[in-house]
Amino acid sequence: MPKERRSRRRPQPIIRWVSLTLTLLSLCQPIQTWRCSLSLGNQQWMTTYNQEAKFSIAIDQILEAHNQSPFCPRSPRYTLDFVNGYPKIYWPPPQGRRRFGARAMVTYDCEPRCPYVGADHFDCPHWDNASQADQGSFYVNHQILFLHLKQCHGIFTLTWEIWGYDPLITFSLHKIPDPPQPDFPQLNSDWVPSVRSWALLLNQTARAFPDCAICWEPSPPWAPEILVYNKTISNSGPGLALPDAQIFWVNTSLFNTTQGWHHPSQRLLFNVSQGNALLLPPISLVNLSTASSAPPTRVRRSPAAALTLGLALSVGLTGINVAVSALSHQRLTSLIHVLEQDQQRLITAINQTHYNLLNVASVVAQNRRGLDWLYIRLGFQSLCPTINEPCCFLRIQNDSIIRLGDLQPLSQRVSTDWQWPWNWDLGLTAWVRETIHSVLSLFLLALFLLFLAPCLIKCLTSRLLKLLRQAPHFPEISLAPKPDSDYQALLPSAPEIYSHLSPTKPDYINLRPCP
């Protein structure tokens, strides 16, 4: 349904909104492909003003989770953003300022179907290559958006936001016919083996993902009968027909296989929601550009870089050692200075006490002499014979005081510097002696490490090489059951008539990264 607008008057900067609302309740089947075509043009003499088209719908949480799946480089990508409080999804992701482009969203009831095993590139939401042409006095840019939606219900609104100088607008939307259903021959479905179908299906998938490697689990796809009886199990993911990997192998000797479980070799095709569903094994994708079997090469460091690094490390350690030693020396010097002050105060106090003691002895001797003179004047003998007691005299020893005065200062008796061996005295300052001490210590440490270096290097290199040789591997399929087990084996290969087998219901495929 095209809409056109042409104007020959002087253009003005305006904004155009072109909206299209469709009721897809009666039109949309389980899977629909829509082709959105937009042409934008401006007058040739007014080319300085950029034009941009934005295509918006609504947001779907399924789409946001779908963005975390392992996309290949050639698969369509999108980014999530918020504009005026509403979430917006951009196809493709914006890269700088674009002259022509769009942003798209998908409703809560619709989601893109890509990538999935068995899909071709035209089934994925993607942009066609933009083209430019001249139409009269207009430059016209044309681009097509392909959307592949499923299970659409309710109103589906597409809005193009276009701004420029009176642009020429042509917009159309139409549905691409559904691909024909695969023609399965009228044969017994019990003879449809799963292994052959997997191989044929993966061969078709390789065309859609040329830059990816496809991995699968080496186990048959045991699955609950969710496709037949609409049953669910607790350890099965939402919307998946295959359970988790730990229950892909089912011991059939423990329970009846007809109660709740399905053997894919007995029935591989199912008719679900107006289409055939194909039970598939767990398949995953990996980017070949990031996964390589060749181990990364080890580049030897240049000798100049090694010497520079070693020299810088040595100089840094030497500086740290000198700084620490200088700080310790300063603290020790401060402590000695404080102790010297305390020592001087003690010596002064002792000398003063000795002087006072001498004065007391003089007073005692003077008093004794006065008493003797008084007793003799009175006609008696001296004091001691009169009282009939031995006379005592105060004798003060000065040897300890003399030794205390001969003490040298504490700074001269305590060494704060590193002592040279064999009592060498080169007349160097404390900083120079500390620096030489640090350099000699590092030199001795380096000599010690040189003796242990060969052993350490050998151990480290062997460990690193062992880790580097562990290249990523892809598991191969195993057609035989595990030995000494009760697991059922798979049936023989399928006839060549199943070469055109392809899926039409890819909801039950589990895509996850390779281990």
Curated annotation (Swiss-Prot):
A motif (CX6CC) lies at residues 384-392. The record marks 301-302 as: Cleavage. Residues 457-515 are cytoplasmic. This is Envelope glycoprotein. A motif (CXXC) lies at residues 212-215. One of its GO terms (biological process) is virion attachment to host cell. The gene is env. The 17 amino acids long immunosuppressive region is present in many retroviral envelope proteins. Synthetic peptides derived from this relatively conserved sequence inhibit immune function in vitro and in vivo. Residues 330-376, 388-420 form a coiled coil. Glycans are attached at residues 129, 203, 230, 251, 256, 271, 287, 351, 398. Keywords: Cleavage on pair of basic residues, Coiled coil, Disulfide bond, Fusion of virus membrane with host cell membrane, Fusion of virus membrane with host membrane, Glycoprotein, Host cell membrane, Host membrane, Host-virus interaction, Lipoprotein, Membrane, Palmitate, Signal, Transmembrane, Transmembrane helix, Viral attachment to host cell, Viral envelope protein, Viral penetration into host cytoplasm, Virion, Virus entry into host cell. Residues 34-435 are extracellular. Pfam families: TLV_coat (PF00429). The surface protein (SU) attaches the virus to the host cell by binding to its receptor. This interaction triggers the refolding of the transmembrane protein (TM) and is thought to activate its fusogenic potential by unmasking its fusion peptide. Fusion occurs at the host cell plasma membrane. The transmembrane protein (TM) acts as a class I viral fusion protein. Under the current model, the protein has at least 3 conformational states: pre-fusion native state, pre-hairpin intermediate state, and post-fusion hairpin state. During viral and target cell membrane fusion, the coiled coil regions (heptad repeats) assume a trimer-of-hairpins structure, positioning the fusion peptide in close proximity to the C-terminal region of the ectodomain. The formation of this structure appears to drive apposition and subsequent fusion of viral and target cell membranes. InterPro entries: TLV/ENV_coat_polyprotein. Specific enzymatic cleavages in vivo yield mature proteins. Envelope glycoproteins are synthesized as an inactive precursor that is N-glycosylated and processed likely by host cell furin or by a furin-like protease in the Golgi to yield the mature SU and TM proteins. The cleavage site between SU and TM requires the minimal sequence [KR]-X-[KR]-R. Residues 365-381 are annotated as: Immunosuppression. Disulfide bonds join 212-215, 212-392, 384-391. One of its GO terms (cellular component) is virion membrane. The mature envelope protein (Env) consists of a trimer of SU-TM heterodimers attached by a labile interchain disulfide bond. A lipid is attached at residue 455 (S-palmitoyl cysteine). Residues 304-324 are annotated as: Fusion peptide. The chain crosses the membrane at residues 436-456.
